[in-house]
From Swiss-Prot:
<keyword id="KW-0687">Ribonucleoprotein</keyword>
<dbReference type="InterPro" id="IPR036049">
    <property type="entry name" value="Ribosomal_uL29_sf"/>
</dbReference>
<keyword id="KW-0689">Ribosomal protein</keyword>
<comment type="similarity">
    <text>Belongs to the universal ribosomal protein uL29 family.</text>
</comment>
<dbReference type="InterPro" id="IPR001854">
    <property type="entry name" value="Ribosomal_uL29"/>
</dbReference>
<dbReference type="Pfam" id="PF00831">
    <property type="entry name" value="Ribosomal_L29"/>
</dbReference>
<dbReference type="InterPro" id="IPR050063">
    <property type="entry name" value="Ribosomal_protein_uL29"/>
</dbReference>
<protein>
    <recommendedName>
        <fullName>Large ribosomal subunit protein uL29</fullName>
    </recommendedName>
</protein>
<dbReference type="GO" id="GO:0022625">
    <property type="term" value="C:cytosolic large ribosomal subunit"/>
</dbReference>
<dbReference type="GO" id="GO:0003735">
    <property type="term" value="F:structural constituent of ribosome"/>
</dbReference>
<dbReference type="GO" id="GO:0006412">
    <property type="term" value="P:translation"/>
</dbReference>
Amino acid sequence: MAGKKKLLAELREKSTDELDAFIHENKKALFSLRAEVGLQNKAVKTHLFSMYKKNIARSMTVKQEKEGKIDG
């Protein structure tokens, strides 16, 4: 829980370009994990899938907050 709040605080401090770079890095990492699964690599850490997906979702939410697209 503390890690989630720390990550959100760090994401809110970043600029839009930095958020885009963070999203891109996480998408690349997620893609490489999927490629490893496709190659049937037995050493794939499956918990990383949800971690990367959640990081992407959180950063996109922060990006939308900055752009004022979230009703609240």
